[in-house]
UniProtKB/Swiss-Prot annotation:
HAMAP family: Ribosomal_uS10 (MF_00508). InterPro entries: Ribosomal_uS10, Ribosomal_uS10_dom, Ribosomal_uS10_dom_sf. It comes from Synechococcus sp. (strain JA-3-3Ab) (Cyanobacteria bacterium Yellowstone A-Prime). GO terms for cellular component: ribonucleoprotein complex; ribosome. Keywords: Ribonucleoprotein, Ribosomal protein. This is Small ribosomal subunit protein uS10. Pfam families: Ribosomal_S10. The keyword Ligase does not apply. GO terms for biological process: translation. Coiled coil: none annotated. GO terms for molecular function: structural constituent of ribosome; tRNA binding. Involved in the binding of tRNA to the ribosomes.
Length: 105
């Protein structure tokens, strides 16, 4: 029995600012639609929350602490049946510096 393997591109995006992440996702989906590919997403993944506990005083008073947190927002976009035009358009796409992108073929 022959299985139909469909080619897809999986794009994982990470950012500290969710607004930058959403605008980047919109640009990628719009580019994929213009080149007649089929985008699925953006699919939101769980936000990672990293807490840092720091002493306020430089030498004493261990009871006084300050907490900082960093939130990492993540999204996945799948692009099915991409053409060479789709890949070229995605390579030329200008995205903000605060967004980390991983592409898997």
């Amino acid at each position: 029995m022959a299985t139909l393997t469909q080619q897809k591109i999986r794009i994982r995006l990470k950012a500290y600012d969710h607004r930058l992440l959403d605008t980047s996702c919109d640009k990628i989906v719009d580019t994929a639609r213009r080149t007649e590919a089929v985008p699925v997403g953006p699919i939101p993944l769980p936000t990672r929350r990293r807490l840092y506990c720091v002493l306020r005083s430089p030498h004493t008073d261990k009871d006084s602490r300050e907490h900082f947190e960093v939130r990492t927002h993540r999204r996945i976009i799948d692009i099915y049946s991409p053409s060479s035009k789709t890949i070229d358009a995605l390579m030329k796409l200008d995205l903000p510096a605060g967004v980390d992108i991983e592409v898997k073929l």
